[in-house]
Amino acid sequence: IEFDYCCVHAAYALREQGYETVMVNCNPETVSTDYDTSDRLYFQPLTFEDVMDVIEVEKPEGVIVTLGGQTPIKLARALKDAGVPIMGTQPEAIDLAEDRDRFAALLDRLNIACPPSAVASTMDEARDAARRIGYPLIVRPSYVLGGRGMAIVYDDSDLVTYMESATHVTPDRPVYLDAFLEDAIELDVDALCDTEECYVGSVLEHIEECGIHSGDSACCWPPFSLSEKIVDQIRAITKKLALACGIRGLLNIQYAVRDEHVFVIELNPRASRTVPFSSKATGVSLAKYASRIMAGEKINELRAQGLLPDENRTVDYYAVKEAVMPWSRF
């Protein structure tokens, strides 16, 4: 529902700017498939072939792929190669952020710290990585949503058990291994970027220990235990990375803070599941303004209209998000 929220607010915002909006979605439980959300709705699955069928009929000025989660963003490269104009973050920037080796090289070039990590497609590679990085490790398969298949392993026995249970591990679909930073504080940052300037919408502090998936975590805005110096450092790193990657629209960066040291966990070149909470907590409609940026507006133009308040403003409240589990469905 978080990505549904983003798509709906983007459709409303673009309609206000004079665009006709076309929604492609096959989930009947979402608001974005309501008849009055967009100008036209195609009840189609998000596959390259089905989306191209829609594009051949509609001939759109552009396609937005960064508000619906991981499924549409994986279509960006194929769509652009087929001549479809992509609005917002381009496939090259998406690849830079999502390719583990290239992103690690970027962090190294910018002198930004990250937990030691490795990629493995065989048991031997996983063992070698574990010896090099050290336990405990967070291990997870590639190309999954919602933290599915993620686990913390503490020794060789745990690692063997995980690798044996991880199906379809191939060179194209490897397992990621990251050093698990024990006793660290995890943060989510949602931001807007127009390739020239970055606006940090929120810095969310997780209430649980590091390692809970962002969408399922309890978190708080503004941060309740971090120093102003650390928050300023996180904002500065976010801006540096957003501009270096060439993001246009929304991005999300996950951080870990341990002993006053800041580590980048990953950058998502798209909307995250924390965007609705960030928007409601701060009063800044991130999805709405991201869509306007993707349509060509600049952050300084939005700021001049009074739409983007000062990032360093103080508020007299705390906003807290907690996950509500649908126990009746289990």
Q: What do these predicted regions represent?
A:
Residues 61-67:
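Periplasmic-binding protein-like
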Residues 1-60, 71-73, 88, 110, ...:
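ATP-dependent carboxylate activation and anion-phosphoryl transfer catalytic cores
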Residues 43, 67, 95, 121, ...:
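Small/polar loops that bind or transfer phosphate-bearing groups
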Residues 18, 82-94:
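Short, acidic/small-residue loops that bind anionic groups at enzyme active sites
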Residues 70-83:
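Short Gly/Thr/Asp-enriched flexible loops that form oxyanion-binding sites at enzyme active sites
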Residues 89-150:
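A conserved helix-loop-beta module that forms one wall/lid of the active-site cleft
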